[in-house]
């Protein structure tokens, strides 16, 4: 069946070698502008469905807009190479792997991805952006704490006000100490982000002088 998200020939798989004990290789998808040097690098973080055709299409669109876009897997420790669809079984499988992540492991992988992108493209401006969706949006908020990440965009990142991957204080509580810029986009009818969570996110962003 033809994919609803066709991929122009501007992307390729890029595997980053681990640099910490227990860290797996990261099989990322790199999309580059076809006609000019990239203006900046962006990490693209998936929902619970892995680096699938849709996420690769997001990287492609960013590349066509002039960016070096690196789609980064979030479940490399439990499901390397995961690509899921969107049926109920896929949701169950994706949630299974999500519950086995930790903030420390995710941040280590994102730091590796940011540094790997800089090494692959040494002429890029210093620092990267980060964009993530749903669970990837939650992780994009975490990524704002990394020195390599200049700006993050969290699209409907659920659970930031009440939890943190692997346990610990809610991710939102660390926002004030994060050096990177952050934009959060929440849907008014998103059942996974109730109004009280949206209010908490808005208050934290305002207190930290961030966007919302």
Report the location of each language-model feature.
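N-terminal cap/leader regions of alpha/beta-hydrolase-fold enzymes
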Residues: 1-212
């Amino acid at each position: 069946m033809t994919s609803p998200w066709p991929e122009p020939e501007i992307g390729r798989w890029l595997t980053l070698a681990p640099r910490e004990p227990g860290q797996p290789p990261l099989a990322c998808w790199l999309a580059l502008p076809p006609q000019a040097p990239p203006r900046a690098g962006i990490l693209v973080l998936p929902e619970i469905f892995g680096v699938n055709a849709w996420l690769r299409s997001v990287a492609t669109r960013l590349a066509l807009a002039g960016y070096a876009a690196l789609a980064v897997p979030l479940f490399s420790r439990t499901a390397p190479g995961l690509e899921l669809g969107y049926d109920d079984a896929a949701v169950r499988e994706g949630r299974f792997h999500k519950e086995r992540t930790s903030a420390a492991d995710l941040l280590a992988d994102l730091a590796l991805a940011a540094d790997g992108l800089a090494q692959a493209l040494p002429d890029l401006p210093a620092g990267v952006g980060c964009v993530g969706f749903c669970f990837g949006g939650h992780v994009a908020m975490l990524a704002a704490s990394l020195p390599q990440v200049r700006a993050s965009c969290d699209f409907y990142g659920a659970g930031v006000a009440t939890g943190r991957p692997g346990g610990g204080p809610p991710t939102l509580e660390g926002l004030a100490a994060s050096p990177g810029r952050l934009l959060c986009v929440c849907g008014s009818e998103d059942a996974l982000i109730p109004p009280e969570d949206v209010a908490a996110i808005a208050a934290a962003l305002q207190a930290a002088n961030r966007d919302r």
